[in-house]
Amino acid sequence: MVWMRSAIVAVALGVTVAAVAAACWLPQLHRHVAHPNHPLTTSVGSEFVINTDHGHLVDNSMPPCPERLATAVLPRSATPVLLPDVVAAAPGMTAALTDPVAPAARGPPAAQGSVRTGQDLLTRFCLARR
């Protein structure tokens, strides 16, 4: 059964990679050159002309794939992060490396704290009902 699960994961990964490749790198029919967004109406002058031959979403045109992934917005921290991580991980590592099973002692098992016989229990219940 393990090989079946591995095969399913491999097929799913292959389909995902094929979908990404088809969306970005395979030739597409009737593809227009991507253009930047239209300028704001406050900056439009007489030079703005409506061009009806450029790509839009209704024309099935797609922008080109980005060259790289998006970068993080937050700046990198200059504080050392290793020390708090080590302090936080130390108790977990200690607990994982210790043996949680206590060694068994030789001899019969220890007696329970309060073991009662059946007659003692019946007497106790009868006295409680009176």
From Swiss-Prot:
Gene Ontology BP annotations: response to copper ion
Residues carrying lipid (S-diacylglycerol cysteine): C24
Induction record: Repressed by RicR. Induced by copper.
Signal sequence coordinates: 1-23
Membrane topology: Lipid-anchor
Assigned keywords, A-Z: Cell membrane, Lipoprotein, Membrane, Palmitate, Signal
Places the protein is found: Cell membrane
KO phenotype (gene knockout): Deletion mutant shows reduced growth in Sauton's minimal media and is highly sensitive to SDS and copper when grown on solid media. Reduced growth in acidic media (pH 5.5) and under hypoxic conditions, with decreased survival in hypoxia. In vitro, the mutant is attenuated for growth in PMA-activated THP-1 (human) cells. Mutant is extremely resistant to copper and shows increased growth in vivo. In vivo infected guinea pigs exhibited a considerably attenuated infection, and a few animals cleared the infection.
Domain of life, source organism: Bacteria
Gene Ontology CC annotations of this record: plasma membrane
Primary localization: membrane
PROSITE patterns: PROKAR_LIPOPROTEIN
N-palmitoyl cysteine-type lipidated residues: C24
Role of this protein: May play an essential role in M.tuberculosis replication and survival inside the host cell.
Name used for this protein in its record: Lipoprotein LpqS
Organism: Mycobacterium tuberculosis (strain ATCC 25618 / H37Rv)
Gene this protein is translated from: lpqS
